[in-house]
Amino acid sequence: KEQVPFLASEPLSDAMVWSKGNDYTFRLRPSTYMQAKMLAEEAAKLPAKRWVTVAPNYEYGQSAVENFKAALKELRPDVEFVGEQWPALGKIEAGVTVQALLRERPDAIYNVTFGADLAKFVREGSLRGLFDDRSVVSLLTGEPEYLLPLGAEAPEGWIVTGYPFDQIDTPEHDKFAEAYRASFNEEPMVGSIVGYTTMKSIAAALDKAGSTDAGAIIEALSGLEVDSPFGPIVYRSADHQSTLGAFVGRTAVVDGQPRMVDWHYAKGGDYLTGGDEAAAMRPAN
């Protein structure tokens, strides 16, 4: 409407670049679709067949569940989803939710809650034995913003997407992390990576455009290559989604502190649809 270029940094909604995508909007973070596919790839290796899901009842949670189901069923046609819980965001009744999931006798759980809801879910689930002898796959839970506040109560062995901020040993991340610690005297979080890479992307786009004209900036952002602390990324011309990835691993508690272990970096571009398919999902101009 306003015809102003917009680089969305934190939002995860698939609609932003697909069903409601437009010429002016670009997105940095790996989307719900991308991260759900990353987790489904690991979930498919589990023996679990009976799955339940728990997610906040709004677009993010709904699309996270829908994408995970579709991706896992494609890899493992034998699995079945036997129950769903949809707590209101920020208002989870954790005891009720946990009991409802227990009644379904699942082999595994897919969790999309985060923040205060996650802490309540973890506490009640642990008290009531929900996680005993069950696999849990959990979106975003390895991000330090959500994992560190759990402290020694953090669950162990969950398969998560996240950011093992103190374990990555690459030149590009070392350079960023050292500068960040020197500037702020604290460890970087996912938000730190996102904020830094957003600013680098905008600067690169302005430099390439050579002006602040909206059309020139859009043209510059389409196909733009940027160096991030996770390595080089590209903003795809087809849908304006960047190829920034995420780390996938398991949760653990080491010396009383939660952390990610057994992790690997999942390149964002490997978990996106083809360019033609993405373009077809966008509204016609």
Go through each PLM region and give its residues.
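Short, well-structured alpha-helical segments that form the helix of a local strand-helix-strand
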Residues: D213-F230
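Solvent-exposed, acidic/polar segments of extracytosolic/periplasmic ligand-binding ectodomains
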Residues: E225, P229-N285
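Surface-exposed patches in mature extracellular/periplasmic domains of secreted proteins
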Residues: T53-P56, E187-I193, A214-I217, I233-V234
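Extracellular/periplasmic Venus flytrap/periplasmic-binding protein
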Residues: E10-W18, N22-L127, P164-K175
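Extracellular/periplasmic periplasmic-binding protein-like sensory domains
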Residues: E124-Y196, D207-T212, M260-A284
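Catalytic-loop motifs flanking and including active-site residues across diverse enzymes
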Residues: Q35, A64, D117, V194-T198, ...
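Short beta-strand elements of ligand-binding domains
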Residues: P5-D14, S135-T141
